Regions:
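Short, acidic, metal-binding catalytic loop of nucleotide-sugar glycosyltransferases
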Residues: 1-10
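Acidic helix N-cap motif at the loop->helix transition within catalytic regions
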Residues: 22-30, 54, 72, 76-78
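Active-site acidic Asp-centered loop
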Residues: 18, 67-69, 94-96
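Glycine-rich, basic loop-to-helix element that forms the pyrophosphate-binding segment
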Residues: 43-59
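A conserved acidic beta->alpha catalytic loop
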Residues: 17-26, 46-47
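Short aromatic/hydrophobic "clamp" motif used to bind/position activated sugar donors
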Residues: 64
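Donor-binding/catalytic cores of nucleotide-activated saccharide
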Residues: 72-203, 210-227
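C-terminal subregions of glycosyltransferases and related glycan-biosynthesis enzymes
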Residues: 204, 208-266
Length: 266
């Protein structure tokens, strides 16, 4: 559980069990008893958006950071994000991330009999290990960030919540800054597009701070085409409104339309 091992120790760690009936809750309960920083919340299943919104309402810290259950943080992740936010008075800090596709052989793998650790041989065989980060390191204005976003409008880098640090007071001050509970796909991009409307100062990190494990059986891959099309059509209007608000719509019109047919780096 990497969040406990962060070099930044002034943490409140919220663990939200969204109705899981497996061993997740007992494990989380054990961790919460061992670490006073952990707040354990057990709730009926309501989906990722409602769960994140509950977590944001209950969080007491200055900043908000998100970690999905299947993924891991680098030990320095939170410290680096907070440090850059403080040093630059940033409303949002965005960082590069690693995408890892675990090795899963279709048939029994042939292992080297001369090497003793067979388990290690298997776990080290990764189909892909890629680092993604589209912005150069440094401070930028909202307009500069928005122009960068338009270069990769469908990317995980801009769309997800787990490679970013948000100001909690900015989220609390605006009731529309939340994950859409009506959407079942790209609800995190909806959150980011809404948050960007109120943020003014941005900072980008080129160091990868998050390890995203790309599981072919995850909700991202199992989303129905119709669901994805419906979500993209809805999000297109949010893109359009944001760039009209910034006075950047006309010069980015083609790139905004590109979002409808673009694919993510995953």
């Amino acid at each position: 559980f990497r969040s406990r091992r962060q070099t930044y120790e002034n943490l409140e760690i919220l663990l939200l069990n969204d109705g899981s009936k497996d061993v997740s809750y007992p494990v989380c309960e054990m961790l919460s008893k061992a670490d006073a920083r952990i707040v354990l919340i057990d709730k009926e299943n309501s989906g990722v958006s409602a769960t994140r919104n509950l977590g944001m309402r209950m969080a007491r810290g200055k900043y908000l950071q998100f970690v999905d259950a299947d993924d891991t943080l680098e030990p320095f992740a939170t410290e680096l994000l907070v440090q850059r936010a403080e040093d630059n008075n940033a409303d949002l800090v965005i960082a590069a991330y690693n995408r890892i596709v675990p090795y899963k052989p279709k048939k029994e793998a042939k292992l080297d009999p001369l090497l003793p650790n067979k388990k290690k041989q298997l776990t080290e065989r990764l189909a892909k290990f890629q680092t993604f980060g589209f912005l150069p390191m440094g401070f930028m204005t909202k307009e500069e960030f928005a122009c960068g976003l338009m270069q990769e409008p469908a990317s995980f880098y801009y769309g997800v919540m787990w490679n970013k640090l948000y100001r909690a007071d900015l989220v609390r001050a605006h009731t529309d800054v939340q994950c859409s509970e009506e959407m079942t796909w790209s609800e995190d991009l909806y959150f980011n597009l809404t948050y960007i409307r109120y943020a003014e100062r941005f900072f980008a990190l080129t160091a990868p701070i998050y390890n995203y494990y790309d599981n072919p059986g995850s909700a991202v891959h199992l989303t129905k085409v119709r669901t994805a099309i419906t979500a993209r059509t809805a999000l297109f209007s949010y893109y359009k409104e944001l760039y009209e608000q910034l006075g950047l719509y006309e010069e980015n019109k083609l790139q905004i339309f590109k979002y409808l047919i673009s694919s993510s780096e995953a």
